[in-house]
Amino acid sequence: MIRRRGPPSQTWRTFLRNHAEAIATIDLCVVPTLTFERLFAFLVLGHGRRQLLWYAVTRHPTSEWLAQQILEAFPWNAAPTYLVRDNDRVYGQAFTRRLRTMGIRDRPISPRSPWHNPYAEQLIGTLRRDCLDHVLIFNERHLRGVLTLYSLYY
C-alpha cells in the first residue's frame, strides 16, 4: 500500500507552544502543619507565562469546593480552553460538570504519571524547596499568607 503524502502534522511540543495561552494546569499540594495536620493547597498555573493564577487552602478538599475554586479562578469568561489535571478522586462529578458549563476541555493525565503534568509538579517542587521547607505552617490563615507572598515572588 502506498503511503499518502499529506501535510506534516505538528509535534506535541509545537502544539503546546502554539496553544500555551489557552492551557492551564491544576494540582493539589499537601502541606503539613506544626500540629501535624494536613492542609491542601489548590494551585492553578497558566502555561503561557507559567504564572500562578490562583491558589486556595482547605483542610478537606471536595469536588464541590474545587468546582467553586475553578469558578473563582477564571471569572468573566477568562477561562482557558484546556485544563490539564491529574486523576485524583477528589475531582468528581461536580468539578467536571462545572468545567463543561464553563466551556473548558478537561484533559486528565495518565494514572501514576506526574511527569505528564510537569509545570504543576515544577511549581509544587519550587514552592517546597524555596518556601515551605524553611517555614513552619501554623494553620490555614498562615498558609494563605505565605502563598500570597510566594505568588508575588513566583
Model features per residue range: what roles?
Residues 1-154:
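Charged DNA-binding/catalytic regions of mobile-element recombinases
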